[in-house]
UniProtKB/Swiss-Prot annotation:
<comment type="subunit">
    <text>Component of the chaperonin-containing T-complex (TRiC), a hexadecamer composed of two identical back-to-back stacked rings enclosing a protein folding chamber. Each ring is made up of eight different subunits: TCP1/CCT1, CCT2, CCT3, CCT4, CCT5, CCT6A/CCT6, CCT7, CCT8. Interacts with PACRG. Interacts with DLEC1.</text>
</comment>
<keyword id="KW-0547">Nucleotide-binding</keyword>
<feature type="binding site">
    <location>
        <position position="41"/>
    </location>
    <ligand>
        <name>ADP</name>
    </ligand>
</feature>
<dbReference type="Pfam" id="PF00118">
    <property type="entry name" value="Cpn60_TCP1"/>
</dbReference>
<dbReference type="GO" id="GO:0032212">
    <property type="term" value="P:positive regulation of telomere maintenance via telomerase"/>
</dbReference>
<feature type="modified residue" description="N-acetylmethionine">
    <location>
        <position position="1"/>
    </location>
</feature>
<feature type="binding site">
    <location>
        <position position="409"/>
    </location>
    <ligand>
        <name>ADP</name>
    </ligand>
</feature>
<feature type="binding site">
    <location>
        <position position="96"/>
    </location>
    <ligand>
        <name>ATP</name>
    </ligand>
</feature>
<dbReference type="GO" id="GO:1904871">
    <property type="term" value="P:positive regulation of protein localization to Cajal body"/>
</dbReference>
<feature type="binding site">
    <location>
        <position position="494"/>
    </location>
    <ligand>
        <name>ADP</name>
    </ligand>
</feature>
<dbReference type="GO" id="GO:0061077">
    <property type="term" value="P:chaperone-mediated protein folding"/>
</dbReference>
<dbReference type="GO" id="GO:0044297">
    <property type="term" value="C:cell body"/>
</dbReference>
<feature type="binding site">
    <location>
        <position position="93"/>
    </location>
    <ligand>
        <name>ATP</name>
    </ligand>
</feature>
<dbReference type="GO" id="GO:1904874">
    <property type="term" value="P:positive regulation of telomerase RNA localization to Cajal body"/>
</dbReference>
<feature type="binding site">
    <location>
        <position position="94"/>
    </location>
    <ligand>
        <name>ADP</name>
    </ligand>
</feature>
<keyword id="KW-1017">Isopeptide bond</keyword>
<keyword id="KW-0143">Chaperone</keyword>
Amino acid sequence: MMPTPVILLKEGTDSSQGIPQLVSNISACQVIAEAVRTTLGPRGMDKLIVDGRGKATISNDGATILKLLDVVHPAAKTLVDIAKSQDAEVGDGTTSVTLLAAEFLKQVKPYVEEGLHPQIIIRAFRTATQLAVNKIKEIAVTVKKADKVEQRKLLEKCAMTALSSKLISQQKAFFAKMVVDAVMMLDDLLQLKMIGIKKVQGGALEDSQLVAGVAFKKTFSYAGFEMQPKKYHNPKIALLNVELELKAEKDNAEIRVHTVEDYQAIVDAEWNILYDKLEKIHHSGAKVVLSKLPIGDVATQYFADRDMFCAGRVPEEDLKRTMMACGGSIQTSVNALSADVLGRCQVFEETQIGGERYNFFTGCPKAKTCTFILRGGAEQFMEETERSLHDAIMIVRRAIKNDSVVAGGGAIEMELSKYLRDYSRTIPGKQQLLIGAYAKALEIIPRQLCDNAGFDATNILNKLRARHAQGGTWYGVDINNEDIADNFEAFVWEPAMVRINALTAASEAACLIVSVDETIKNPRSTVDAPTAAGRGRGRGRPH
């Protein structure tokens, strides 16, 4: 008698296992790498991605591109996640980490097809990664923090390396200096929140500026605003979460009115409530009043008569940055505006930038903060500039915390490749082949740099292998002269942390994908979502 089959999974569940599904997962990861392969390096191309809502994004940043791709393959999502983690951890090297992970998998694919056990591959990869990380730490060059001039030079070079593959690479010296200035203005915690980036359309990139303080766009203002002064020295700043508008209180109360005088008394009380608030603010000594909620026309004119400046509907993050920079605290009532809840700064002024007016707070005593004001033409271009600066800022922060650097341009990868290849020849068994495969995979970075620049990769890699075998540790691809060069001398520097993180993350992702032996996809729920309730009559949009 036939045994009854045990049905464990729901009908329609897609389950695949064994070597074919592992090979399929590896192939999916290679497809993801293909998407960002051409963006690597100073001659990398950009991608134009249009999302479901029709918003266009032009980007060269691996993490941004992978976030915008709607990846559904479960194994390929792992690569998207490591690119995101690299972006969050060190800010740069997102394309490199994706390429490395895909190349590690590509190199072990033949061994997987031949039936080599995944655990042997994972063991070899972990050994190779540990050796590579130790080697980076051993050969990385440490820059002395005590020498401020040297340290600044190092930081600028690291920022320029991060910016050289971006759209703004032509202005990398200009922006690298600004980025280093910005990070140097921060306190020891180097909080990213304390650097604001505002974009103003129009003008050239070189018109961008760095403000040593807080800056935000002038908010919507009512009549009477033009009478207010636009510049103060050492003002006190009131930060409020209070609505300063005339409110009809009859909406909030039920009142029986017998005479006209009673009604007049109610109207007078409404005015008095508002004037009472305004007087308290005036008596507190504040010269600049910022509120998250609207400040109406009556209040605007009241402040103008008393030489005070006000701005309502200030975005919350700008209000918080002003509070962190100028001191004080955001008040939800005006009843206790004492001196210790008011902020201070050296200069407040409103200035025209392009077609916009901006409010500037400079010389803030409390916390070090700064704001980039970016200029440029197309909106997409300015957004890409903002992403590029974010990468450079992250790199400079990392370089301050960990002061060891390595040479970029494929130099460190070639050196590690040579070191691991030599090591693999000293060990017996299957590990030798796998560590050799890991070493070969590292060459994808210089190879892709050559391919993206249109060079003969085979020729340049042969030269690099020969030079590294002779002891030229820092030799990498010279993009400008279609040759190889000592990239440490050429100041193509990046923090050792970037490379360590990239190698570790790529190796972990490769091990994770190799260790999966079965993929089970549950069927999509077939129950239709409940239809949206019909809109009220006369309110529905036309279908």
